[in-house]
């Protein structure tokens, strides 16, 4: 559809744009630029509804209530300290002490119940709000994408879209769901602590505020760095995702060229760039937490030292001092835990930057004009139209083009590749805005018309047919969207669909399929042949009876019988309609009312077929070059045997051996009970292997984490000693008074900063290296898989891109912050347990009994989160994969006005998991609330029983506080580990999928060294009695006992109806698949006995739909070199042979010119010729051309055929073709029907037989 481009901007805003002083810059810039917007954390809530805001406020309220529980607990602890001091001094009797202890314990029980309820409500509410708002962002993003002009997508790749719909939105959701509740709870704790502190002792509270100011400053500074580094990391990930999506989309080309290792190596610098920025984010995070915890311990020292001074002045008692000390420090402690939450929030804001920029971008074609109010006649006028593409501002694709297309007439456009033919259609459809000139429809400037209404007046069939995953009926019915028939019943719609399919010559093959019109076509129509897809696309274009038909190589993928039948149908459909036909095959336009011959963006000739044929000029040359060598021809007659259509492309044949890495069975079953093939221990061992080389860093990190965790039991001792010292009648007389313990806290602070900082840095490096290696493994093992693996809809390019970029990233949940927290918490629990047992075993045994409850509750929640993560990720990846598929076909979506339909499909997929998500969230929140509330119950029990032991004089006050403090921090640490349950659950799911991928053994394994290694071959190819099923459960074979062959150096042609098995033979020869039975042999050796890599090195394949990669022309061509260094002269010679040399020389940077994803701004012919040049550089012994010249104009086709004929000397050549002029010079031609050879012979022999081949030649005659 599109015309040449030379360079691809690196983003939607840069790269290949003209310089700022270029006169066309504003016109081109506005077609692709993204608005510059400023995003902060609160911007993430801009799409929340009133209901969601209400639920968020309720959740925030209960989060605040939850946060206030600990300061209230400290208030009671302070009262208990004062009561115990009074009891020790003899100022209150034992009975009063017992009564006050009971009251305090009962109040703490109330706090336990309040915590249980409040945590459940805020957790559940935050998770639901986060899911709802993120889904709203996803929906807005997808709707905005489908609103954009087509030029925007030429620089904004589908890989980036996939990454943003999966990885980036997951980051946003993480920032606005549970994390916000935890953040509010921590802030509430902080505020409540200060409120109590100011009430109890405002002077001491004010002094201790200095430390909190320092903590806040550290958080602000460090968060700024994290946001900056996080944005760089997200940008690097988006670039890598684009490369991944491009690779998986062209997996057949990758396999045919043997590019697996090369592409892995090329991706590595981008993965290293992601690791570079990721490590910086985690380094900053680790040291921020270390400094914050160090400041907390300094605060303890300051409080003890200053509190003692106040006590010396007689201004306050020890209870108030301890209350202020513990309140401010527990507030600062929990506030210090917001570090990971702030990191998540800053990463969420960074991830939203590009997403919100797309959402807020106004398309240059989406002016919002009301639908047209006039009756369309179909008069079209181009007036002085000039056009350039943003990446080539110095090259005019159209130059001052003026032309009238009369209403009700058929106008054909022909010309060489890149002459501007398809650009005319693109501008008429408003895919691009011309840089000058105007286009009128019935006298109305089309830029003033509503773009959707305008496109509804057209029926467009593109050169490369695009179908969407769904039934045939649904695909054809898409053509009715937005028209007067769009809301009709299925019965009425079916009649319209059936009639359109009859005209498009598709009805017979559709009814022959197992499910008829309800047959699923698969991703991109994978279950149908190219010709079948083309006919369905034609039916979709004409089903609504549009006023104007735009046919851009509409019959290029059809066999000759189908082409003739469809052409007759199109002639019928064109009656009374304005029809514009872009064509290379001149046999399809002989009856046009006017034929325009384009050359370099200008009109070179125009007239009828007869007039132009009689004139000396380009058209006459085209006709002469397409003329077939013929015997005496007769008109086609009843002897013509229609092609028998069978599904001719793969639709996943999965068995246990070749199963999906996304599990077995139907999605509903998977939703109910996601299968787990591996135990937790197996997965941990598997993930640990990625950090095997980092064992020294791991040991350093673990040792530092143990020291960091052991600080808290030491803190318990220091704290108890300080309380005893402050409670003493004469603290100054003590050998180790309050000042000594204040100094010990200064020492403890520096130990904590050093140990936690080293821990954070060590695990930061380990986590990012783990992700780097896991991504490398994931990509390499995916490239190892055979083509059959990628035929599975669950392994689409979008889903696999998400797997490498997003899923694998989740493995950090088993490393980094989580690993540090796990070892630190373990050291705290074990250290506290040992200390407590040594100091007071009775109280320890009673209070420690609650920790197993925390662990069980956390474990159950972990399992629930894992289940929820599997369901949620499956839905999001599949829906993102569909969007990616649709964006790749955005021209078809836009031309058919399917934007709203595609958006609604996406929204329905998001809503499909709402009930499951709600149920899992309720259970998960309940168990999490229990794990958070149990420590308060533990404290209640501990204070009651411990105080009772003190009252009985079995324990001293020092023993009591050492044990209780150690147990409190032990229980809190145990609960803190399970706060990472969501991250841990994601990591578990990702580890399982990666393990399944690594364990999967492909049937055709490019890693295998087995088989004979061959340096060269004679090129003798044989297919003997081959039967082949794309689907193991299919009853109809695609190839049915077929036998054919080619002698060394011989050229053979394969022709026949769509679905007859031509391309399947090519796929078997390339060993994309193994035959179900029979033998494919090379030099009389079964190809399965030859090493796959050395086998494919003897072959070169040029596909019907050419694929080029996002790099320079030189790099694209060198992909065919088998790793050999080639000189420029060798490359240029290949370009000359492929008739693309002149075009390359016309580009600003020649061979070093880069272009966008799949070279979308090159014409189909230019892409095809570059693909042929790449094949020539491969110097193959066997050359496979699967419709290799289908996209070429007649001049280029004839030149390329001559070049291929020359290069084929001494090589075996297999040519698959619909256009018989391509294969008439072959040594032997095989005409296929229903997967078997119906006729064979030379062109002359087959013409003499007057069979199906003879009839096909008749149908393509230009005479």
Curated annotation (Swiss-Prot):
This is Multidrug resistance protein sirA. Its EC number is 7.6.2.2. Residues 380-625, 1021-1259 form the ABC transporter domain. One of its GO terms (cellular component) is mitochondrial inner membrane. Belongs to the ABC transporter superfamily. ABCB family. Multidrug resistance exporter (TC 3.A.1.201) subfamily. Residues 1-21, 635-672 are annotated as: Disordered. Residues 57-347, 699-986 form the ABC transmembrane type-1 domain. PROSITE patterns: ABC_TM1F, ABC_TRANSPORTER_1, ABC_TRANSPORTER_2. It comes from the Eukaryota. It comes from Leptosphaeria maculans (Blackleg fungus). It is an enzyme of class 7 (translocase). GO terms for biological process: oligopeptide export from mitochondrion. The gene is sirA. GO terms for molecular function: ABC-type oligopeptide transporter activity; ABC-type xenobiotic transporter activity; ATP binding; ATP hydrolysis activity. Keywords: ATP-binding, Cell membrane, Glycoprotein, Membrane, Nucleotide-binding, Repeat, Translocase, Transmembrane, Transmembrane helix, Transport, Virulence. Induction: Expression is regulated by sirodesmin. Expression is co-regulated with the other genes from the sirodesmin cluster and corresponds with sirodesmin production. Disruption phenotype: Leads to increased expression of sirP and subsequent production of sirodesmin, as well as to a higher ratio of deacetyl sirodesmin. Sirodesmin transporter that provides the dual role of sirodesmin export and self-protection. Also provides tolerance to gliotoxin. Its main location: membrane.
């Amino acid at each position: 559809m599109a015309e040449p481009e030379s360079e691809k901007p690196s983003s939607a805003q840069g790269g290949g744009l003209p310089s700022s002083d270029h006169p066309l810059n504003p016109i081109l810039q506005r077609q692709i630029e993204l608005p510059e917007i400023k995003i902060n954390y609160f911007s993430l809530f801009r799409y929340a509804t009133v209901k969601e805001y209400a639920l968020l406020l309720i959740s925030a309220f209960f989060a605040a209530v939850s946060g206030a529980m600990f300061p209230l607990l400290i208030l009671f602890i302070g009262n208990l300290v004062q009561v115990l001091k009074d009891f020790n001094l003899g100022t209150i009797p034992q009975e009063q002490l017992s009564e006050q202890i009971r009251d305090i314990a009962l109040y703490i029980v109330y706090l336990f119940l309040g915590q249980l309820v409040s945590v459940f409500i805020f957790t559940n509410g935050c998770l639901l709000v986060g899911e709802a708002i993120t889904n709203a962002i996803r929906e807005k993003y997808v709707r905005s994408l489908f609103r954009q002009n087509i030029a925007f997508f030429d620089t904004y790749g589908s890989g980036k879209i996939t990454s943003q719909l999966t990885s980036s939105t997951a980051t946003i959701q993480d920032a606005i769901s549970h994390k916000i509740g935890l953040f509010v709870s921590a802030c509430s704790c902080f505020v409540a602590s200060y409120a109590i502190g100011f009430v109890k002792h405002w002077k001491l509270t004010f002094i201790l505020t200095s430390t909190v100011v320092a903590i806040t400053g550290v958080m602000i500074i460090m968060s700024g760095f994290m946001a900056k580094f996080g944005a760089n990391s997200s940008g690097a990930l988006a670039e890598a995702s684009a490369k991944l999506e491009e690779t998986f989309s062209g997996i057949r080309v990758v396999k045919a060229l043997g590019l697996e290792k090369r592409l892995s190596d090329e991706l590595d610098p981008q993965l290293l760039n992601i690791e570079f920025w990721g490590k910086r984010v985690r380094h900053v995070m680790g040291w921020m937490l270390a400094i914050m915890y160090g400041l907390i311990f300094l605060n303890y020292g300051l409080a003890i030292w200053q509190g003692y001074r106040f006590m010396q002045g007689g201004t306050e008692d020890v209870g108030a001092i301890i209350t202020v000390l513990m309140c401010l420090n527990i507030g600062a402690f929990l506030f210090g835990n917001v570090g990971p939450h702030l990191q998540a929030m800053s990463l969420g804001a960074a991830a939203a930057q590009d997403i919100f920029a797309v959402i807020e971008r106004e398309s240059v074609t989406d002016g919002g004009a009301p639908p047209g109010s006039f009756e369309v006649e179909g008069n079209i006028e181009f007036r002085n139209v000039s056009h350039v593409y943003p990446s080539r501002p110095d090259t005019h694709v159209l130059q001052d083009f003026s032309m009238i297309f009369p209403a009700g007439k058929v106008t054909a456009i022909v010309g060489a590749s890149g002459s501007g033919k398809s650009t005319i259609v693109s501008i008429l459809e408003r895919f691009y805005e011309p840089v000058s000139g105007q286009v009128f429809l019935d006298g109305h400037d089309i830029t003033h018309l509503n773009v959707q209404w305008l496109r509804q007046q057209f029926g467009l069939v593109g050169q490369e047919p695009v179908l969407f995953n769904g039934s045939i009926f649904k695909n054809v019915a898409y053509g009715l969207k937005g028209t007067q028939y769009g809301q009709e019943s299925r019965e009425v719609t079916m009649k319209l669909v059936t009639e359109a399919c009859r005209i498009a010559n598709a009805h017979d093959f559709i009814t022959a399929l197992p499910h008829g019109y309800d047959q699923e076509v698969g991703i991109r129509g994978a279950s149908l042949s190219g010709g079948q897809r083309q006919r369905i696309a034609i039916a979709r274009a004409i089903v609504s009876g549009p006023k104007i038909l735009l046919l851009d190589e509409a019959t290029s993928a059809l066999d000759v019988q189908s082409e003739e039948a469809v052409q007759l149908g199109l002639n019928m459909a064109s009656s009374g309609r304005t029809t514009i036909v872009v064509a290379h095959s001149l046999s399809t336009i002989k009856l046009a009312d006017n034929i325009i011959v384009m050359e370099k963006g200008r009109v070179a000739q125009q007239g009828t077929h007869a007039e132009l044929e009689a004139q000396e000029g380009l058209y006459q040359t085209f006709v002469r070059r397409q003329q077939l060598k013929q015997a005496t021809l007769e008109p086609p007659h009843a002897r013509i045997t229609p092609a028998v259509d069978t599904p001719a492309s793969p639709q996943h044949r999965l068995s246990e051996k070749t199963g999906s890495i996304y599990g077995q069975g139907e999605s509903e079953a998977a939703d109910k009970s996601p299968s787990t093939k591996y135990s937790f221990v197996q997965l941990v061992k598997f993930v640990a292997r990625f950090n095997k080389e980092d064992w020294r860093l791991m040991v350093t990190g673990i040792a530092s984490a143990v020291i960091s965790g052991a600080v808290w039991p030491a803190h318990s001792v220091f704290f108890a000693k300080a309380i005893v010292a402050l409670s003493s009648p004469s603290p100054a007389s003590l050998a180790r008074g309050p000042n000594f313990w204040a100094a010990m806290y200064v020492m403890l602070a520096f130990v904590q900063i050093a140990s936690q900082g080293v821990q954070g840095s060590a695990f930061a490096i380990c986590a990012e290296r783990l992700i780097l290696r896991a991504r490398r493994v994931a990509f390499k093992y995916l490239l190892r898989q055979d083509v059959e693996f990628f035929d599975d809809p669950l392994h689409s390019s979008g889903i696999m891109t998400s797997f490498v970029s997003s899923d694998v990233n989740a493995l950090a949940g088993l490393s980094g912050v989580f690993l540090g927290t796990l070892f630190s918490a373990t050291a705290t629990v074990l250290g506290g347990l040992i200390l407590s047992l040594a100091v007071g075993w009775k109280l320890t045994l009673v209070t420690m009994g609650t920790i197993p409850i925390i662990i069980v509750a956390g474990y159950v929640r972990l399992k629930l989160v894992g289940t929820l993560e599997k369901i949620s990720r499956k839905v999001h990846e599949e829906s993102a994969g569909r969007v990616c598929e649709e964006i790749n076909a955005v021209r078809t979506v836009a031309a058919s006005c399917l934007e709203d339909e595609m958006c609604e499909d996406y929204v329905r997929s998001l809503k499909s998991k709402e009930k499951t998500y709600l149920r899992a969230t309720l259970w998960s929140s309940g168990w999490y609330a229990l794990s958070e509330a149990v420590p308060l119950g533990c404290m209640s029990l501990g204070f009651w029983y411990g105080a009772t032991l003190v009252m009985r004089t079995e324990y001293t006050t020092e023993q009591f506080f050492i044990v209780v403090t150690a147990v409190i921090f032990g229980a809190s640490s145990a609960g803190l580990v399970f706060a990472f349950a969501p991250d841990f659950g994601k990591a578990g799911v990702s580890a399982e999928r990666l393990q399944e991928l690594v364990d999967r053994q492909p049937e055709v394994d490019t890693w295998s060294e087995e088989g004979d290694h061959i340096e060269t071959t004679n090129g003798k190819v044989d297919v003997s009695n081959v039967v082949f099923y794309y689907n193991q459960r299919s009853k109809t074979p695609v190839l049915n006992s077929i036998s054919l062959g080619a002698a060394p150096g011989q050229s053979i042609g394969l022709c026949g109806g769509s679905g007859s098995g031509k391309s399947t033979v090519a796929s078997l020869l390339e060993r994309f698949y193994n035959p179900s039975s029979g033998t494919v042999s090379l030099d009389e050796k079964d190809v399965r006995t030859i090493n796959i890599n050395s086998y494919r090195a003897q072959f070169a394949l040029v596909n019907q739909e050419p694929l080029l990669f996002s790099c320079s022309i030189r790099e694209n061509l060198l992909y065919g070199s088998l790793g050999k260094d080639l000189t420029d002269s060798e490359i240029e010679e290949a370009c000359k042979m492929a008739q693309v040399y002149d075009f390359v020389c016309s580009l600003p940077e020649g061979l070093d010119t880069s272009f966008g994803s799949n070279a979308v701004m090159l014409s189909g012919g230019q892409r095809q010729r570059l693909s042929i040049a790449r094949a020539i550089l491969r110097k193959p012994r066997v050359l496979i051309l699967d419709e290799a010249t289908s996209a070429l104009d007649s001049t280029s086709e004839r030149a390329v055929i001559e070049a291929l004929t020359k290069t084929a000397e001494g090589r075996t050549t297999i040519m698959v073709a619909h256009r018989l002029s391509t294969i008439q010079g072959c040594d032997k031609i095989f005409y296929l029907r229903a997967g078997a050879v119906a006729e064979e012979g030379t062109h002359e022999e087959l013409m003499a037989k007057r069979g199906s081949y003879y009839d096909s030649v008749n149908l393509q005659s230009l005479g």
